[in-house]
Amino acid sequence: MLSYDYENALKVGEISLEDINKVDFANAYSNLMEKLDNGVVGFRDVIYDENLDKYKSLNGYENVVVIGMGGSILGTMAIYYAISPFNNNAYFIDNSDPEKTLSILKKVDLNESIIYIISKSGNTLETLVNYYLIKKRIEKLNSFKGKLVFITNGGKLKREAEKNNYDIFSIPENVPGRFSVFTAVGLAPLYSLGVDISKILEGAREMDKICQNEDILKNPALLNGVIHYLYDKRGKDISVIMSYVESLKYFGDWYKQLIGESLGKNKHGITPLLSIGAKDQHSLLQLYMDGKKDKIITFMVAKKYRLDEEIEFEDINDEKISCRYSDIIRSQQKATEIALTNNGVPNVRITLDEINEMAMGALLYMYEMQVGFMGELYNINAYNQPAVEEEKKICWRLIKQ
Ligand code: PA5
């Protein structure tokens, strides 16, 4: 599924195995396990929910429209774009930008669509307004042959769904939005999009077994968490995901939310950034290598690309070279890794065997566990988002003025 390499995080010489062992990670580990065992937080329990039959009626629509914000949509996008980067019957309305939303609504035939309205609170402004845009269009149709599905626990949207007898799925209360991709929030729309959700859960469960390991060197979530924690303490508080698989771009967006919203509290926090290799070697690499030394890089690579071929070309000295096309991007990644390490920039590497459902389930779950461990290391509540809630309240006030 995936492997994790951390040798370059030690090679640059700023932290050692001894430093790692000095961190009280055993306490972080047992605190998180206690929270998961006692149901204080439920993101582990949901990967063991085997009842996927409940999604069976959600198949067979030409288009899948998903409306939601933040944790209610980013995980779905991360998995969908990784698994099916070249399909285009998916429409994600994840903002209130009129040009984006209205151009999607112009294009999509609602009669041929299953439309998901996803909001745990049921009161998020953007989601509510985007639903009303859809509602207005549906009301104008003579008869609506598509399907509306609500994934919500309450608020205005749940009342709307109940009033109109729409399908409703709920989200376990102890699973916060950004940890909810393995609930109906992610699984229902992914199922409609043809993604094998049982394999996603299988990948997450395999990773869960690995993350139960108390030996930090055998537990990538714990180890990556401690490495990022130690570098943060040394002033390297910007965590860059540099993916050499472009279809992981939306995984990067999900990562930014998970890290930013979970750990950015009480003056703590790591700033997550996303870069795409090899493109960003021609832009941001200058900053990463030669600029302020405040970053730790996570390379994301694939052992096997789903499309590949033999190529032949001539180099600048007219010498013939033949190789696989994927050897080019692999060499670029390796070269960047060596150069960064030589310049004292710590980096780790996650290698996915192939981009598929199992690997994506494992990857997202690994990060959920990592952030859970990191919340314990910083002694903060990784599962709330008071600052986000504060803005939501102010915005409701402004809109009503
Ligand atoms: O992680 C979170 O809790 C947030 O990002 C929410 O997912 C986001 O604000 C949307 O909230 P809701 O699902 O209530 O519409």
From Swiss-Prot:
Pathway: Carbohydrate biosynthesis; gluconeogenesis; Carbohydrate degradation; glycolysis; D-glyceraldehyde 3-phosphate and glycerone phosphate from D-glucose: step 2/4. GO terms for molecular function: carbohydrate derivative binding; glucose-6-phosphate isomerase activity; monosaccharide binding. Competively inhibited by 6-phosphogluconate and erythrose 4-phosphate. GO terms for biological process: gluconeogenesis; glucose 6-phosphate metabolic process; glycolytic process. Optimum temperature is 89 degrees Celsius. It does not lose activity upon incubation at 80 degrees Celsius for about 120 minutes and still has a half-life at 95 degrees Celsius of 40 minutes. At 100 degrees Celsius, an almost complete loss of activity is observed after 30 min. One of its GO terms (cellular component) is cytosol. Optimum pH is 6.3. 50% remaining activity is observed at pH 5.3 and pH 7. Signal peptide: none annotated. It holds the Pfam family PGI. It catalyses: alpha-D-glucose 6-phosphate = beta-D-fructose 6-phosphate. The active site is at E261 (proton donor), H282, K392. Catalyzes the isomerization of glucose-6-P to fructose-6-P. Belongs to the GPI family. Homodimer. This is Glucose-6-phosphate isomerase. The lineage of its organism: Archaea, Methanobacteriati, Methanobacteriota, Methanomada group, Methanococci.
